[in-house]
Amino acid sequence: MNQIDKKIISELLKDGRASYKQLGDVVGYTIMGVKRRVEKMISGGLIDISARINVSALNFHAVLILLEIESQEALSKCLERFKECPRVLKMFTLLAGHNLAVLAIAEDRDTLECESMEKCSLRSTHGVRRTEFYPIGSIHYSPFLKVRLDLATKDRDVAPCNVQCNTCSSYKEKRCVGCPATKYYRGPL
């Protein structure tokens, strides 16, 4: 990545919809020159261009979950179990006592609480020794997060984590809106 690439990336961070002409004007390149550079950065895995959502505008709640998982095998199974969870935004392995951090969202406080305690929670995963659950108050610098709406298909009988919402007491008692990947989902996604 050189200085031209950095300028292009900086402009795309300001406005991901900037045209190749606008980018070219900033860096002094033609439309085709900028297009080639952007495509090369995308195909090389350096950048991606996608929509992010202001979760605060939707009144969603973000949470940071720290987990200590007993083994690499259990960690791999946990990563696989939640790979297609629409509420999990990011999972980070850590080099610390807690060896996994998860950034997730919930549609409301009750669902957030269920997300921390029910069968579909990260805490309930086999091999988890301990967890810490930190609801996030404010998101600073940019409120936009990459919510995985493409996973909120509302068409499955069973959630990606292999839990059935329709048999869950929290779902039945309307304390949880259900998984956005299932046909039982009652939320806004």
Where are the regions that the model predicts?
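A compositional/biophysical signature of low hydrophobicity enriched in polar/charged and small residues
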Residues: 1-189
